[in-house]
């Protein structure tokens, strides 16, 4: 067992060092983006490998494990952010690129809400829309719904707006740096998606309880277990506020989805 522990620890340390090095390079020169995208794709395959998942779960050094997870969560979130920025710039310059990691995310959108599907009469809020807001664009184009994206990064907001102007100029899409408490039409929001790389997503969810209507549905992207090295994990919620009505565990996808409704709304899993 110690050999397995040492192996998984070594692999994760190597990934951490690679991500840190690639991130510094790509900040200096966009040409290194392909190497970072390749690393992200390889990392995704590693996470979805059942053998490594077993080794990760068997690793019992809690403190050492937790520290590595925290470091990997942070650096991979920064890498995703930077890749989105460069992809946005390239698209605006007339170039296009794709990676397995981003394909994985974009192909997951149809699964977000199960039977609580989005229609043209709905309004979606995406918390953490990023510089390359394909979720917003895909939802708006496929459903006709009104969509709002919020992000605390001014660069992401600027690039996101420009991407929307190019790819979906006729859709009802708003991107802003406002906080959830500052959104004037927050009561009209019917569906909410949280990006998986937001560390404070459960604090924002708690804040949303008093701001939103009684029937709002929340899709929380998360990663537990080995998936936590590329996502922030799920957390318990106050039983009298948000009720997790379904956890959609997806062995072949890089993150899973937890569906929440307000505790006052009694909904069974079969209704989701």
UniProtKB/Swiss-Prot annotation:
Induction: Up-regulated in metal-poor media.
GO biological process: nicotianamine biosynthetic process
Disruption phenotype: Cells lacking this gene produce neither staphylopine nor the biosynthetic intermediate 2-amino-4-{[1-carboxy-2-(1H-imidazol-4-yl)ethyl]amino}butanoate. They also show a decrease in the intracellular content of nickel, copper, cobalt, iron, and zinc.
Reaction it catalyzes: D-histidine + S-adenosyl-L-methionine = (2S)-2-amino-4-{[(1R)-1-carboxy-2-(1H-imidazol-4-yl)ethyl]amino}butanoate + S-methyl-5'-thioadenosine + H(+)
Enzyme class: transferase
Classification via InterPro entries: Nicotian_synth (IPR004298), SAM-dependent_MTases_sf (IPR029063)
Keywords, alphabetical: S-adenosyl-L-methionine, Transferase
Superkingdom in the source lineage: Bacteria
Enzyme Commission identifier(s): 2.5.1.152
Gene Ontology MF annotations: nicotianamine synthase activity
Keyword Transferase carried by entry: yes
Family: Belongs to the methyltransferase superfamily. CntL family.
Role noted for this protein: Catalyzes the nucleophilic attack of one alpha-aminobutanoate moiety from SAM onto D-histidine to produce the intermediate (2S)-2-amino-4-{[(1R)-1-carboxy-2-(1H-imidazol-4-yl)ethyl]amino}butanoate. Functions in the biosynthesis of the metallophore staphylopine, which is involved in the acquisition of nickel, cobalt, zinc, copper, and iron, and thus enables bacterial growth inside the host, where metal access is limited. Therefore, this enzyme probably contributes to staphylococcal virulence. Appears to be specific for D-histidine as substrate.
Official protein name in the record: D-histidine 2-aminobutanoyltransferase
Classification of source organism: Bacteria, Bacillati, Bacillota, Bacilli, Bacillales
Gene name per UniProt: cntL
